[in-house]
Structures are given as C-alpha cells and as structure tokens.
Amino acid sequence: IAIALVVEGRYSDFTLVNETVNAARNNRRTVRFAGLINAVLRRFLREREQISAVLQKDLDVRFNAPLWWIRRIKESHPSNWEEILRIGTLRAPMTLRVNARRITPAAYLEELKARGIPALRVGRSAVMLESPLPVKDIPGFTEGIVSVQDAGTQLAAEILAPQKNEQILDACAAPGGKTAHLLESADCHVTALEIDPKRAELIKSTLLRLGVEATVRAADAAMVSEWHSGREFDAILLDAPCTASGIVRRQPDVPWSR
C-alpha cells in the first residue's frame, strides 16, 4: 500500500516511510518486519525509475490487466488499443444524466453552480461533476431530476433515438438506466426484460424514482413464447454479452475475475 501511495504522489516520501514503519512497529504482529519494510521502501525510492522502466515493458503490469484481456482489446481496436487500456487504469469521473422531462442540462448546471458544485456538460444529457459526491448529496437525485450514468452508456439510448408511440424492447434491462433514458427521451412504450427477478425489481425502483413507466418483466429474452404478446417492436436495445468491459475503471478486478 505504501509503494502504491508513493507512485500516486499525494504524500511526501518521508511521510510515507515514517508513517508506514511506525504503523508496523505499533502492531505486535508486524513489529518484527518494521526494519524490512523500512529497507524495502527506501530501496524502492532510490530505484523507482529503474523499477518503473522494467515494469512498463510488461503490458499486464502497465495496464493492470491479464494478457488475454489485452489481446482482446488489441484485436478489437488495433488503432487505439493502448489508449483504451490506459484510460481503463484511470479513476472514472462521476457523470449524471439529466432527466429531460424535468429540467434542461443548462438549467441543472445553473443549479449546481448556485450550490458551489463545479460541473461540465459532456453530452446531450450528460453532466460531469468535477468531484464525485455521495448519491444522497447529488441535487435532484432523490426527486428524479438526475441519475448517475456514464456518458458512454448514455449514447445507447441516443443512438437508438426513440420516437413517439414506438414499441421498444430493452432485452437486458437491469438496473434500468437505459430503459429510463429511453422513456425520458420520448413518449414511447418500453418493455424491459431482466432474467433475474431481484434485478427486475431494481428497474421498477429506478422508474418510480424518475416518474416514468414501462412494462417490466422478469423473463429470459431468449424464451420469447413466455413473455412476448406477439406485437412487433419498432426497436430493440440489447446490451450483450454483458462482459462488464465498460466498467473496468470502477471495478478494476473485472479483467482478472472474468
């Protein structure tokens, strides 16, 4: 942990070494390792540039991802795979989706400004906070004025571009962000499917908070006869195969655990 903090650079080298060694000395289980910890940290500080240069040659260390993951990204995005992997190692910003039925992004930005919360518009309905906030402290969240949703994720509903009275299927809908975005964008009719009954309840909670309605069913989209009424859909939103590759900045263990 101390070495990670050294790399991060938020504290002075002296402070990190001193506090880490003192913490080891004050714990009966680690007191005997205090000298070793001190030696390792000081050597790292002396040789950090050489160590970093060696580690940067190993792609799995450089991008904090297994080689199979790196190969897959490289095959899918041959022209910018390094940038994609690099961004995956950074902390994700907090981005909000403004509920177009309740307020405009410009008006919401003014409200944030009045509260002393720095933010920037980064998409049609996307507002990025300069610093993350607990959900309970986000102005308008509880009232359904905004939702937390990455800017990239918001593109799904925008590209689908729902129209008035269209019948739309969201085939893998939990926790309901994309379903809600469709309904905020147009007076359409959405059928939201989720195979997990508990996650289907999350969709209902999301829609209730935002003041929009959809037909929510706990069902397997592949078992069409069990849920489909026979009415044709004008559009289908399918977020599959649900690899979680888009959330590695928030859950860095994803490449290692899947």
Model-flagged regions — what are they?
Residues 1-258:
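S-adenosylmethionine
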